[in-house]
Amino acid sequence: MVKVWWLKLMIKIKINGKDLEVKPKTSIIEVADQVGIDIPRFCYHKKLSVAANCRMCLVEVKNFAKPLPACATQVMEGMEIFTKSKFTKDTQKSVMEFLLINHPLDCPICDQGGECDLQDTAVAYGASKTRYTEEKRVVFDKNIGPLISTDLTRCIQCTRCVRFLKEVGGMAELGLVGRGEHAEISAYVDKSVESELSGNIIDLCPVGALTSKPFRYSARSWELVRRNTVSCHDSLGSNIEVHVKDNIIKRVIPKENESINECWISDRDRFSYQGLYHKDRINNPLKKVKNQWKEIDWEEAYELIKNKINTINTKKPNQLGILCSPQTTIEEGFLLKKISKQLNTTHIDHRLLEKSFSKNNNWLGCKIEEIESHDSILVVGSNLKNDQPLLAHRFRRFAMKNNSFSIITSYDDFNSTPCLGKIIGNPSTYLNYLLEILKEVQSVTKYKINSESIKNALKQIKVSKETKKISESLTRDKSKNAIFIGHQVLAQIEGDNIKIIAMHIAKAIGATFGVIPGYANSVGLSELNLSLDEVNTDEVINQKKESFIMINFDPYFDYHSPKKITKALKSAKFNIAISPFVSDSLKEFDIVLPMTPPTETSGTYMNMEKRLQSFAAVTPPHGKSRPGWKILRVLANFLELEDFSYDSSDEIKVEAIEEINKNYSHNIKDFENSKKNKIPQGLELISPIRAIDSDMIVRRASALHQNENIDQAFAYINPKTMLKENLIDDQKIKVSSEEAEITIKIKSDEKVSLNSILIFGKQLSTASLGMNHKLKIKRSS
């Protein structure tokens, strides 16, 4: 009996004589994949729209005179499909012959050789020789950037790359121009492809037309050893497959995990491996001797550290400050916490870029795959495309399906995302906007607020049209809404207040509340309760310490105030860096211990949805560098601390998970009506961090930094603000903050909020400004 799809009932069909019951509106190719019947395809991909232009999936269907494309034909009651009949095989052989007419016979030099869909399909479904003897066409290759190499003569016009960049990347950066044999893939006006997800078109291309430029001609596919691991560059925790030859990483591709990264990865995850082999990488422990680095052995390094720390601890207690990267694994974080307790120091933290230090609700609040199941979403203060490129794709997909996505941000980088409500304002205005939403929501839901300080703040608030529109979308008769706050909020002086108000809004409407964490193990270290006694990074830096231990970060780039951290390091008597790299930023350190990056160690990360993901080393340690957990374990043994006899990271993980499961309770701060820190008047600095500058490894990945002018810093200002300040495009100005003064060129950008200057953070020429200040400007002479 035929049952209609909206009642979720099934229809009966036959494939190759086999009776099946399937859901209506399912394509033939989807049904075949579900039951393990192979149908060849080039243009079809389960995550992209149907194009049906390669015709390779043509199959015979009973009562149809012509073969039908399996990707574009939906099953019907009683349909009989034949994928192995002579008619189907002859059709597929003809299509294969047609596709190979202009394809060059250059498989021996093609990077796709050995893993090419065209090769495999030609062998399985094609003829043994061609009848075509005419000249083949040649298509000139195009330069579409430093990441993707083009050999467009090989292209079979499947348009997977075109559809991916438009539908997933959000920008139509490639297109199919021309008709018939003149058709070819082209970038618009010969521009490069700049999507943060562009590298996925390399994997999507079924032939060798698009290949990895950094990987080009470096190895054959059968020479590579494939090892699975987890990305360390954002809090999504993308699953990746690393390809290794001679213990050197040659390329990185996605490992499918539908609930996290689906079958995609960001360009940052794909190409950052180049940074692992940068000239700054160190092989041996280094000791500062007359302002020069001298290589020493591990035992000498440990003895030196032991003597210095014991001397400092004997004279003054609690004089050791410990700061680590939020990329630190759970095992390393657990050992750091254990060391700090036994050394009687409470000054330890990992929140290097944050000024909001409340510990409650520091994760996404839901599973990643549940984002699209919400009815309405509000995101506050997140530069999604740079911070979390694949999460941005999920939000965009939600917005395309539901006209109920709203954003409050300081930079309008959401042109490809349909927004019901969009407020572009300075980070310092986020609190007022959320108070407006809370006031409107309270009037609708009659939500009771007990805090007197919030009540007093709401009395002074007037609700604008923009916030009323967002409030209405959140208070409609819906059962599942969500509010997410991003890194821009956590980096604000008012961050805790913003978080409190956002949580009240979520509570008033029964919505999910979540934080979009910045780094691979931000959530894990918070759950581990790494920062003891509510001490935070700023307090560690501002209190004069005799000694600092800093793990896996660059103090000049990765802390929000380079001036303050440099001053703290200068005043200390002995500083220890545990890092894979050495640079001028470490000039205030006395000793550097070479630590392996995540690809050369084992460990565990907890991603934004609180999912634990363990990984093993994919290559051996570089030189005499050692995994972080081993460095800390041996250091603890030299310091004669108790209970550090671990033989593997797995042993540490067991104890660390027990620590996480203790469920530490944290005091939720009350809303504070007055700002603690008064900042001078001026244009507000917006300092988002580009995906290619986020950490030490990515900053050293050469291919990611090869686009023209990509490392040239500019100050981006709204044209209206430029008019008000009497500034013009390409003018050089002097910009000064509380930290430093720099000279920089202006670019006008309508996406930037009014009365602000956008200067990307963590760049060499601009990092000295620090982050989140008011700026004073004057014309450069």
What residue ranges belong to the model's regions?
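Phosphate/pyrophosphate-binding active-site segments
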Residues: 421-424, 431-489
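N-terminal export/assembly segments and adjacent metallocofactor-ligating motifs
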Residues: 10-33, 41, 45, 60-64, ...
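Short alpha-helices
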Residues: 410-411, 417-450, 495, 504, ...
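Acidic/polar loop patches that form or flank catalytic/metal-binding clefts of enzymes
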Residues: 210-216, 249-251, 322, 347-349, ...
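Tryptophan (W) side chains
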Residues: 5-6
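Long hydrophobic segments that form regular secondary structure
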Residues: 246-263, 268-277, 282-287, 297, ...
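A cross-kingdom feature strongest in bacterial/archaeal respiratory oxidoreductases
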Residues: 44, 337, 373-375, 379, ...
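A glycine-rich, hydrophobic/aromatic-adjacent loop/helix-cap motif
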Residues: 479-543
